Amino acid sequence: GLPQGLADASTSLDRSRRAPAAGAAESERALHKVLVLDPAAGTGTFLSAVIRLIHARVAAGGDSGAWSDYVSNHLLPRVFGFELLMAPYAVAHMKLGLQLIDTGHDFRSPDRIRVLLTNALEGPHELAELPPFSGWPAEDADAAGERDRAPSIMVVLGNPPYSIFGQTPPGPWIRGLLDDYKTGLNERKLNLDDAFIKFIRLGQWHIERRGAGVLAFVVSNTFLDGITHRRMRES
């Protein structure tokens, strides 16, 4: 079990073994077992709550003097957010940075808040060089050779947008993932184009890549009993 929950700082070894054609041999690295992601972070409200909870857990352990080292080595490397718009992205960085300073963290040069200015629904390709996301594109990891992933728990949380109105059409990557929710459906109108459904599918993909996880979104409840959402529920 993980008695510290989101504050768990344990790591496990991740091994990658690529085929000779890929030009690389076996490699290994330590990955944290508990990873946290808000794929529509906005101004960082949910990530702020995560930091507040983790700080309380660490402080309850009676070693508050180690907090700054914990942030550098075990919080910032495994808590992530994605945000598409510049204004909330900037606010999130300021909010989370000030919050960590208020808790007593002393920012060092390598430290960075990992809220990324990116469209989470465009796929993992932009994140390929950023641990723990490196190697996530399936066509790289799966086709090139075998990969024994370190067991970890992916916590995907937040309050993604609900509606399709005013949005640009989804890209091919997320459209391909949504096909799993449409398999065998014969209805004329599927009602599977809302943004929150795309984010649920995205969260499912992240968890499947890691082997276990928790999906905690504030979303519309229409998928709970919608006729055309039955494949989504099964999945």
What are these regions (language model features)?
Residues 1-234:
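SAM-dependent methyltransferase catalytic region
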